[in-house]
């Protein structure tokens, strides 16, 4: 499989962006939602990377990315969730259900956080 390093880098970028917004918001609900996201995304990225390496071997250096646009965190998370859904079968074989399940958990965290940001913050 290819692209795992970029996939993990994408999750690291999400952590960086949401942590930055988390520290700069005046909304308690937004602060809490983003805090839950950046804590959760690192745990899931680590879980995914370890499982991936157990199946396919070492990933190698992680591709660290910089955000193109982060002024709207909801839009940023929506775009990333859509990208994850579009590349998931390029990163991991469709038949590798344990890793696909972790990707489901990752996407679920995005959607739960988007719900909190859109309707509770």
Predicted regions and their residues:
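Amphipathic, soluble alpha-helical interaction motifs
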Residues: 17-24, 47, 51, 83-90, ...
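Short intrinsically disordered terminal tails
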Residues: 1, 120-121
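Generic structural signal for well-ordered, non-transmembrane alpha-helical segments
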Residues: 5, 9-12, 16, 35, ...
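Short, solvent-exposed segments of well-ordered alpha helices
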Residues: 2-9, 28-35, 67-71, 97, ...
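Helix-loop segments that flank and shape redox-cofactor active sites
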Residues: 13-36, 91, 95
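Conserved alpha-helical segments that form or flank metal/cofactor-binding pockets of metalloenzymes
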Residues: 31-60
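Acidic/histidine-rich alpha-helical segments that form the ligand environment
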Residues: 64-118
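Context-gated lysine
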Residues: 6, 30, 47, 55, ...
């Amino acid at each position: 499989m290819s692209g795992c390093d970029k996939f993990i880098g994408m999750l690291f970028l999400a952590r960086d962006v949401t942590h930055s917004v988390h520290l700069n918001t005046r909304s308690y609900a937004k602060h809490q939602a983003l805090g839950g996201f950046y804590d959760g995304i690192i745990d899931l990225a680590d879980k995914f990377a370890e499982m991936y390496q157990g199946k396919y071997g070492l990933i190698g250096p992680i591709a660290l990315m910089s955000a193109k646009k982060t002024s709207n965190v909801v839009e940023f998370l929506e775009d990333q969730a859509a990208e994850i859904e579009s590349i998931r079968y390029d990163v991991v074989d469709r038949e590798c259900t344990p890793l696909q399940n972790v990707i489901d958990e990752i996407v679920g965290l995005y959607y739960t956080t988007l719900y909190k940001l859109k309707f509770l913050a």
